[in-house]
UniProtKB/Swiss-Prot annotation:
Optimum pH is 3.0-4.0. The keyword Hydrolase applies. It is an enzyme of class 3 (hydrolase). The active site is at E208 (proton donor), E324 (nucleophile). SUPFAM superfamilies: (Trans)glycosidases. Optimum temperature is 45 degrees Celsius. One of its GO terms (molecular function) is beta-glucuronidase activity. N-glycosylated. This is Beta-glucuronidase. Its EC number is 3.2.1.31. It comes from Aspergillus niger (strain ATCC MYA-4892 / CBS 513.88 / FGSC A1513). InterPro entries: GH79_Enzymes, GlcAase_C, Glycoside_hydrolase_SF. The lineage of its organism: Eukaryota, Fungi, Dikarya, Ascomycota, Pezizomycotina. Residues 1-20 form the signal peptide.
Length: 541
């Protein structure tokens, strides 16, 4: 499925006027506002996103669930990745890592892919004792055309554990030969090693300099193994430092100042971000996830670090990405992270990141997690299937279609509960996205007519750029829809369902959803669109 053709391109050539959007609503409590958007890329716009932008991080212990193996490849997962490739133009990059990356020890005699032991008093979500064998690397052969980031263990630090990590290098590099390797990673969230509830990994005296020295030493030892086993990958690079946040026990700016990139082997500056915690007091759908201001505040911490690093020339030519991110840390909260409201949050969060020079995002996944985009296998806790957040991934991918020169610009709106963005491809405006974040819940006892009747909508008015050309008659519309923000099923992007039950993740056009929608443009270039509460849309020019 590809984006709609650009039908107003002639309007944009040489256009000098702005777009003005005036959101109004049936609900008179909401104030109207107006904004302007230039037809060409604003001077202060972010850099183009990396291609692909929409990417994933998969918990190390659960990678075999998501990808399968040579005899049983996970075709469902691969189909969902292919769908996103069709939308954004490139298959998502996959980072294999997370907390269990730093628990995982290589066992050359293990016949299974993994051997996992849960310590339920600490975490029921993932194993704290984990070994992986040669069969683990079969999972790198099941998703054609996918590039991977493989995570090595930095957390375990005895001489025998380090040797086991190094013994795994030849298997990893041979599995990722032939264009499958994107980057390596060494360590997950080392800024929590001194404080983690899952176990203390380093003494309180461990500093940024200690971390940098250790990272440089171990990556040099990894490089020696690469030279021996996979010489063509000897100069492959890393994402780093993979900190949990920017305000923990290691300071990311100091870490770069201490020479993290002394070996010139870091391709991307990777940090992690979560809006809040699954069990934090006061976390709600409306105030935490469906809240544009909260998203802006969360991303602002990353942007501040990014600007300092840039100003001090500490990361020249090294893009800033989120190598792991999602809604609520500790695997998300049921009823929040798995709802359609979380899908809308994902659209807002990802597009806002793209507008702030965060060049790629890897949404974190793990079997049975609440915030996952899909559950790859059936378990006694979760059924196999496409989950609500995936549909948000699809809309973001569609908004970012266009190759290597796609830029996103935030269009500030008045309320916490709405957001809008413009997409520019090759310097030209091609799409506008509008997200309504007013929480609208529904109950299964409502009839379909009652649901439609009772659901308010907001009206957004755009003034399209003008030129001497004649205005095209209409713009095309694609909508992200569900019955309400609390829905966990029945979700569509542009009328497509990606449900496992319908066609194992292949796109299926539902007949009860309006598609092919076009909105007429007035002679004066004004176009109006109604966005039901708790929904979103893309207008393609």
């Amino acid at each position: 499925m590809h984006h709609h053709p650009i039908t107003l391109l002639s309007l944009l050539l040489g256009a000098a006027q702005s777009i003005a959007a005036h959101p109004t609503a049936h609900d008179e409590r909401r104030s109207s506002s107006s904004i302007g958007v230039s037809a060409s890329v604003p001077d202060d716009a972010a850099l183009p996103v990396l291609h692909p932008f929409v990417s994933f991080s998969i918990e190390f212990a659960f990678f075999p669930d998501f990808a399968g193996n040579l005899s049983h490849p996970n075709l469902f997962s691969n189909q969902l990745l292919d769908n996103l490739a069709d939308l954004q133009g490139a298959k998502p990059y996959i980072r294999v890592g997370g907390n269990t990356q730093d628990f995982a020890l290589y066992d050359p005699k293990l016949r299974a892919a993994t051997n996992a032991t849960y310590i339920t008093s600490i975490s029921t979500d993932y194993p704290l004792i984990l070994s992986f064998g040669p069969a683990f690397f079969e999972s790198y052969f099941t998703w054609p055309g996918t590039k991977f980031i493989h995570g090595f263990n930095l957390g375990k630090n005895s001489s025998s554990d380090i040797e086991l990590m190094l013994e795994s290098v030849p298997l990893a590099c041979k599995a990722l030969e032939g264009g499958k390797l994107a980057y390596w990673e060494l360590g997950n969230e080392p800024d929590l090693y001194k404080t983690s509830a899952q176990g203390i990994r380093r003494p309180a005296s461990w500093t940024e300099q200690d971390y940098v020295d250790e990272w440089l030493n171990k990556t040099a030892r990894i490089e020696k193994r690469l030279v021996e086993a996979c010489p063509e990958l000897a100069e492959s690079k890393y994402i780093a430092p993979s900190f949990a946040g920017v305000t923990n026990s290691l300071n990311p700016v100091v870490t770069w100042e201490k020479g993290l990139d002394k070996s010139r082997n870091i391709a991307l500056n990777s940090e992690h971000n979560y809006i809040g915690g699954a069990t934090q007091p006061g976390v709600t759908l409306q105030n935490t996830l469906m809240n544009h201001t909260k998203t802006v505040e969360s991303v602002a911490q990353q942007v501040n670090v990014s600007r300092i690093l840039s100003k001090d020339n500490l990361t020249p030519g090294i893009p800033y990405i989120l190598g792991e991110t999602n809604s609520l840390y500790n695997e998300g909260a049921p009823g929040l992270s798995n709802s359609f409201g979380a899908a809308l949050w994902g659209v807002d969060f990802n597009l806002y990141c793209a507008s702030q020079n965060i060049r790629r995002t890897h949404m974190h996944q793990g079997s049975n997690y609440n915030y996952i985009s899909w559950q790859p296998v059936g378990t006694n806790r979760t059924t196999i299937g496409t989950k609500a957040p995936y549909y948000g991934n699809a809309m973001v991918a569609a908004m970012l279609h266009g190759g290597d020169d796609v830029r996103i610009v935030n269009l500030p709106l008045a309320a916490d509960t709405e957001a809008a963005y413009a997409a520019y491809v090759n310097e030209t405006l091609v799409r506008v996205a509008v997200i309504n974040l007013v929480e609208f819940n529904y109950t299964s006892t409502d009839s379909t007519a009652e649901k439609v009747e009772s659901r308010p909508s907001a009206k957004y008015t755009f003034q399209l750029p003008s030129s001497e050309s004649v205005y095209a008659g209409s713009v095309s519309v694609q909508r992200l829809m569900a019955n309400g923000s609390n829905a966990i099923t029945g979700i569509t992007w542009d009328g497509w369902s990606y449900n496992y039950e319908l066609a194992q993740g292949k796109p299926v056009r539902l007949q009860n959803v309006t598609t092919g929608e076009a909105i007429s443009v007035g002679d004066d270039g004004v176009v109006e669109i109604e966005i039901p509460y708790s929904s979103a849309a893309i207008l393609s020019l």
